[in-house]
Regions:
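Active-site acidic/histidine proton-transfer and metal-coordination neighborhood
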Residues: 1-103
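Catalytic P-loop NTPase motifs of RecA-like helicase/translocase cores
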Residues: 79, 108-109
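Histidine-acidic metal/acid-base catalytic patches
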Residues: 16, 57, 61, 84-99, ...
Length: 217
């Protein structure tokens, strides 16, 4: 794995990147449209978490010492680290100096965080990158109740951009600002572009965040 990522890490280093986003793809079902989210992979024993954490620590330490990059772990629906409890476990078994957290507001909500801001504050010291994704609460509820796959939810509109859904981004950015967060805020929302035109929605998300940032300043 270290050898395979060498060229990409060198590109990030050349461009003075500070973090590298890490999304766990082993066993993930996020790309399987016929597989319900309930069938996602899980670590069932503490020893499995410990072993996974040790591998991430080793990889993260290598990235930092070799390229000056911080590993930003992306919790994600349909993967091993999905729920708030999974995030708690991940943070407990990884070294803060080697593994940071990519906090994704939409995946946090969809993963079961009724209050994403509380989860954000809980792990603020580990946050090194942020994806600002909103959710349509009614669609998320239907996805859970009807056993949808991740991709089915995306196509039916579980996610949208900041300012178009249920998440309080004023509270999210206030928490980040209060903690002195200096990293990226990435507007992101997996949607069907035939239904939600990319430019229009990206512009709406940017305008929402920009307005909040200007008020905070």
């Amino acid at each position: 794995e270290i050898a395979r990522c060498r060229d990409h890490m060198a590109k990030l280093q050349f461009n003075d990147a500070k973090v590298v986003v890490y999304g766990e793809c082993a066993g993930t079902i996020q790309g399987q449209i016929d597989t319900p989210l309930a069938h996602r992979p899980r670590f069932l024993e503490p020893a499995q978490w410990q072993a996974y954490g040790a591998r991430l620590n080793s990889f993260g330490a290598h990235l930092k010492s070799t390229y000056g990059l911080t590993l930003a772990y992306h919790h994600h629906m349909g993967a091993y680290v999905e729920s708030p409890q999974d995030i708690d476990q991940l943070m407990a078994v990884t070294d803060p100096h080697s593994v940071g957290l990519l906090f994704d507001t939409g995946h946090a909500w969809f993963g079961g965080a009724g209050d994403p801001v509380a989860l954000l504050r809980k792990h603020m010291a580990r946050v090194v990158h942020v994806h600002c994704k909103d959710v349509r609460a009614a669609v998320v509820a239907q996805a859970r109740n009807d056993g949808w796959s991740f991709l089915t939810g995306v196509l039916y509109g579980t996610f949208t951009v900041p300012g178009d859904g249920a998440i309080d981004f004023d509270a999210v950015l206030e928490a980040l600002h209060g903690a002195g967060y200096q990293g990226w805020l990435v507007v992101e929302a997996e949607q069907d572009p035939a239904v939600a035109p990319s430019y229009a929605y990206a512009s709406k998300g940017y305008a929402t965040l920009r307005g909040i940032v200007e008020r905070l300043d």
